[in-house]
Amino acid sequence: MKKLQILIVLFVMPLIAGETNVPVRVEGHFRNSAMGIDIVKQVKNIIMHSGKLHLATEADSTYILVEIKDTKIRALASAFAAAYALQLSGTHAPFYLDQHVDICTADSMDIIRAATVIGYQIKVLRGEYLKHVMHEPIE
């Protein structure tokens, strides 16, 4: 299968004043596991606007803005937000994404079925702007 270059720019912008320099580490391990279903339910208010994905969690007023070059990988972006919501809830277990579950939109299924991303980690620093760029070929 042709390799796809994926570029994800992740911005984390906490809205709660006073919570600065609080480190939060999110480990995203993407495997074929149905655990992703329950975790994704923690993500609310998924809004697509101008090619960007806005996700708000119930854990606090933090929202995650993800700019995606290829809109067909929106499901992967929502998985990042789900992992972040899981971290905010106090659970530090690895996040598993079921590649056969439609997390966000139907047109993302072809990418999810074709790609298995294992062991990808993102580090989030709450209270500060973080720009994380990922260039990763996926077969």
Place the predicted regions along the sequence by residue.
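Surface-exposed short loop/turn segments
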Residues: 49-55, 62-109
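Sec-dependent N-terminal signal peptides
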Residues: 3-14
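A structural "domain/chain start" motif
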Residues: 7, 17-50, 127, 131-139
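A general structural signal for short secondary-structure junctions and capping/turn motifs
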Residues: 2, 56-57
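Extracytoplasmic
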Residues: 21-23, 59-63
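C-terminal/domain-edge helix-coil "capping" segments
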Residues: 91-139
